[in-house]
UniProtKB/Swiss-Prot annotation:
Compartment list: Cytoplasm
HAMAP family membership: Gly_tRNA_synth_alpha (MF_00254)
Recorded catalytic activity of this chain's protein: tRNA(Gly) + glycine + ATP = glycyl-tRNA(Gly) + AMP + diphosphate
Gene: glyQ
EC number: 6.1.1.14
Protein's UniProt name: Glycine--tRNA ligase alpha subunit
One BP term from GO: glycyl-tRNA aminoacylation
Signal peptide start-end: none
Any GO CC annotation of this UniProt entry: cytosol
Binding partners and assembly: Tetramer of two alpha and two beta subunits.
Originating species: Aliarcobacter butzleri (strain RM4018)
Record-linked InterPro entries: aa-tRNA-synth_II/BPL/LPL, Gly-tRNA-synth_heterodimer, Gly-tRNA_ligase_asu
Amino acid sequence: MITFSQMLLKLQEFWAKQGCNIVQPYDIPAGAGTFHPATLLRSLDSTPWSTAYVAPSRRPTDGRYGENPNRLGAYYQFQVLIKPSPDNIQDLYLQSLEFLGLDVSKHDIRFVEDNWESPTLGAWGLGWEVWLDGMEVTQFTYFQQVGGLPCSPVAVEITYGTERLAMYLQGVDSVFDIVWNENEFGKTTYADVHKEGEYEFSKYNFEIANTEMLFRHFDDAFNECKSCLGAGLPLPAYDQCMIASHAFNTLDARKAISVTERQNYILKVRELAQGCAVLYKEQESDRLKRVGR
């Protein structure tokens, strides 16, 4: 049986062999792997770029106090971005499943059309969900636009739902029963690592989080992002955009934002993301000179 840790390592090994740069998780909370600058900003580059990484993801509204076997407020995605998109990307994906020990000839694997959109990032793309014997385990997206800008050449993003995939590979019905690691020293489960965190962060996100503080955090990050953009610094600006986005997500979980206000906050985050994307793209030639390209 493949453990959760082994699965993540093998995905990195497989995609490294396909030419992807293995980067590390980003150090700011985000709701999805797409938020990582290695995907969001680098997808706008005119030059080729390939990367893969584990993406710890936080979605405060999805927490269920550790009581739901299939729903988490924090989880792991495995993210792949390749630009330009290779013609054999579906075959490569199927090969990655085989590399994990899955005999794809013995399973029903379907690519179901499911176009993707992120209103807060001003991004959208054409793509599919990948269903493995009726369960969605991956999202494929051909980025058409990011931060309101066209992606040229088009990049392909693959996002593995790692917990779902591990549940399937291990034959367990609860995410908390996933074997995280097993060796001569003993066995560690997903529950050992994360169940208490699911309970405590659900309580925090739904009941305890100081909304006045979070509103201040949002405003501070919004203003700091604008200052960084004015200073010509898209990377620090984008950090502040991510901080604002996470503050908004926590406020949303606390039900501190009305339906009308919610749309306004989404538009504010989108304004920041678009500002970062536009400045990042405008500086491309200067940036390439600075890094010696």
